[in-house]
C-alpha cells in the first residue's frame, strides 16, 4: 500500500498578540507596578501559511508456517518534506551562540531513515486449540511532527517578541524601550520521535467457557519531543 498527503497549515492565532506582565509580589500587582513585560510589538505578524507533503509505503503479509504457527510480517516507510512558509517568514537558530537567527527554513532537513518493521506471531503449542501464545513487536515512527511549528510563530525577524524591564507601564507597554528578542527555535538537527512496542500473551481455555490470559506489554520512546529552556540561569547559593 501507499500514502500521499498534501498539507496546508494556515494559522492565524491572535493569542500570540497577548503580552505577559510579571510582578515582583502581590503588593506590586495590586498597585499596578509591573516588573517586566514580554510580548509582541505592534508590527508583529501572527499568521503563518505552511506547506508540506507526507509520503509513505508499506508491505504486509500473514504467513501460515504450519497449521499451529502463523507469522505476521510487515515493513513501513514514511517521510515528510520540509515545511515551507508561503511568505518565507520561518527562522531558526542553528548555532546557539549566533547573534541573530537565520531565515528561510526551520531546521536542517527532515530525517529520511524512517523504516519501521512489524512482527507478530500466534502459536498453538499443543495443537488441540485450547491454548495459544501470541506476541509481537513494532517500531512506530512519527514523521508528521508539524505540530511543533506553532512554537515558531513568535520568532524574529517576522514576529519579534520584546522584553521590557525598565519603567514598565500598564496597559500600554513602552515598546521603544524593548531590549532584545526572545526566540523559540526547533532543534536544528531534529530527529523523528519513535516508539518501540512489544507484547506477549498466553491464553488457556478453562472449563466452563472461561479463558485465562497472562500478558506482558512494554514500550520505549526515543527522541520524544519536549520544550526546554536552554538559557536557565544557574541557581544562586
Model-derived regions, located:
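Short acidic-glycine motifs
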Residues: 1-237
Amino acid at each position: 500500500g501507499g500514502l500521499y498527503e498534501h498539507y496546508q497549515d494556515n494559522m492565524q492565532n491572535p493569542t500570540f498578540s497577548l503580552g505577559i506582565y510579571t510582578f515582583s509580589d502581590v503588593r506590586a500587582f495590586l498597585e499596578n507596578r509591573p516588573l517586566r513585560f514580554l510580548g509582541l510589538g505592534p508590527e508583529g505578524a501572527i499568521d503563518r501559511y505552511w506547506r508540506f507533503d507526507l509520503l509513505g509505503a508499506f508491505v504486509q503479509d500473514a504467513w501460515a508456517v504450519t497449521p499451529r504457527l502463523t507469522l505476521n510480517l510487515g515493513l513501513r516507510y514514511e517521510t515528510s518534506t520540509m515545511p515551507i512558509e508561503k511568505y518565507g517568514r520561518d527562522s531558526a537558530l542553528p548555532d546557539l551562540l549566533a547573534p541573530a537567527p537565520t531565515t528561510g527554513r526551520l531546521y536542517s532537513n527532515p530525517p529520511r531513515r524512517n523504516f519501521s518493521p512489524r512482527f507478530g506471531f500466534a502459536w498453538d503449542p499443543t495443537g488441540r486449540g485450547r491454548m495459544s501464545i501470541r506476541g509481537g513487536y513494532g517500531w512506530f515512527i512519527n514523521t508528521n511532527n508539524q505540530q511543533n511549528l506553532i512554537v515558531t510563530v513568535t520568532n524574529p525577524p517576522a514576529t519579534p517578541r520584546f522584553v521590557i524591564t525598565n519603567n514598565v507601564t500598564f496597559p500600554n507597554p513602552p515598546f521603544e524601550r524593548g531590549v532584545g528578542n526572545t526566540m523559540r527555535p526547533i532543534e536544528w538537527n531534529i530527529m523523528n520521535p519513535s516508539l518501540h512496542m512489544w507484547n506477549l500473551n498466553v491464553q488457556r481455555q478453562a472449563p466452563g467457557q472461561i479463558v485465562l490470559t497472562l500478558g506482558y506489554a512494554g514500550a520505549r520512546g526515543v527522541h520524544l519531543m519536549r520544550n526546554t529552556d536552554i538559557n536557565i540561569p544557574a541557581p544562586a547559593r
